[in-house]
């Protein structure tokens, strides 16, 4: 099913451990007991015994409705797939130190890898408006540094005291 989420947890008779630490359906710790006794406890409540942390000592098993759990898990995965592409924004100043520039580009790259569009803005304060060409150079450098991940959706343009552009991921 989903990547990184194990939906097939050992449950009921599939649990091979002789003893398990049991957590009830409300999340309350019951304690360590033989697997048989824990299974009987789950059956009395009409629920399943699911091994949620097999690598612990003793393994942790939870009493829950496994069918309901699996349904909610697949529902959550479908919801995550539907999330819309967000527009992220990264602001630069005209006088930016190299390390700060690299950090911001790293964030832009992460946004693009996550499938988001990125609006890159160079802000001009006071007399910096005379150096609009330097702002354009910063934006072109960002384009060059992200060309493996992004394409330019809207080229650099001046708007008030800001110069901005929009990058979109190549795979979209």
UniProtKB/Swiss-Prot annotation:
InterPro entries: T_IF-3_C_sf, T_IF-3_N_sf, Translation_initiation_fac3_CS, Translation_initiation_fac_3, Translation_initiation_fac_3_C, Translation_initiation_fac_3_N. Keywords: Cytoplasm, Initiation factor, Protein biosynthesis. It comes from the Bacteria. The keyword Protein biosynthesis applies. NCBIfam families: infC. IF-3 binds to the 30S ribosomal subunit and shifts the equilibrium between 70S ribosomes and their 50S and 30S subunits in favor of the free subunits, thus enhancing the availability of 30S subunits on which protein synthesis initiation begins. This is Translation initiation factor IF-3. It comes from Thermotoga maritima (strain ATCC 43589 / DSM 3109 / JCM 10099 / NBRC 100826 / MSB8). The lineage of its organism: Bacteria, Thermotogati, Thermotogota, Thermotogae, Thermotogales. The gene is infC.
């Amino acid at each position: 099913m989903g990547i990184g989420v194990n939906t097939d947890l050992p449950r009921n008779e599939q649990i091979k451990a002789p003893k398990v630490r049991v957590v009830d359906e409300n999340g309350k710790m019951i304690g360590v007991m033989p697997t048989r006794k824990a299974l009987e406890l789950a059956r009395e409540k009409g629920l399943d015994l699911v091994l949620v942390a097999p690598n612990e000592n003793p393994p942790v098993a939870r009493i829950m409705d496994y069918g309901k759990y699996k349904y909610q898990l697949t529902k959550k995965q479908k919801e995550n797939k539907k999330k819309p592409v967000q527009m992220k924004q990264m602001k630069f100043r005209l006088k930016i130190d190299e390390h700060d520039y690299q950090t911001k580009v790293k964030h832009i790259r992460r946004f693009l890898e996550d499938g988001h569009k990125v609006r890159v803005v160079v802000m001009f304060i006071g007399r910096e408006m005379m150096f609009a060409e330097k702002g354009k150079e910063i934006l072109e450098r960002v384009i060059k540094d992200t060309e493996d991940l992004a394409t330019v959706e809207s080229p650099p343009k001046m708007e008030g005291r800001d110069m901005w552009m929009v990058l979109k991921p190549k795979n979209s």
